[in-house]
Curated annotation (Swiss-Prot):
Keywords of this entry: Coiled coil, Cytoplasm
Recorded coiled-coil stretches: 22-42, 70-104
Broad class of where this protein is predominantly found: cytoplasm
Superkingdom assignment: Bacteria
Source species taxonomy: Bacteria, Pseudomonadati, Pseudomonadota, Gammaproteobacteria, Enterobacterales
Protein name: Pole-localizer protein TmaR
GO cellular component, one term: cytosol
PANTHER family linked: UPF0265 PROTEIN YEEX
Function: Pole-localizer protein involved in the regulation of several cellular processes.
Protein location: Cytoplasm
UniProt key word Electron transport: no
Length: 105
């Protein structure tokens, strides 16, 4: 009887190990994709900045362009924070409803 349980237990341990590895790989892939997106955005930002900066511009003009771009990006960040909060609220409400539905069964 002990021999029957050992392979089964070993299979469970192997399954758990593989499942954890798969999850770790998914997290690493998502992290790398985020890094790729971030760097692509940086390249795009530099391209946009180089389009605005023209020969003969004063330092004040360039600083003004940078300040305006920064303000635009900060506004976008605020919009994303608000959207995330709304999505989190909806997710919590759905979780509560699902929990209630599960308790009714």
């Amino acid at each position: 009887m002990d021999n029957v349980n050992k392979p089964s237990f070993h299979n469970v341990l192997e399954f758990v190990r593989m499942f954890r590895r798969k999850n770790k790989l998914q997290r690493e892939i998502a992290d790398n994709e985020k890094k790729i997106r971030d760097n692509q955005k940086r390249v795009l930002l530099l391209d946009n900045l180089s389009e605005y900066i023209k020969p003969g511009m004063s330092i004040e003009d360039i600083q003004s362009i940078i300040m305006n771009m920064r303000s635009d990006y900060e506004d976008r960040i605020d919009d994303h924070i608000i959207k995330n909060a709304d999505l989190s609220k909806e997710r919590r409400e759905l979780s509560k409803k699902l929990k209630t539905m599960g308790e009714l069964k």
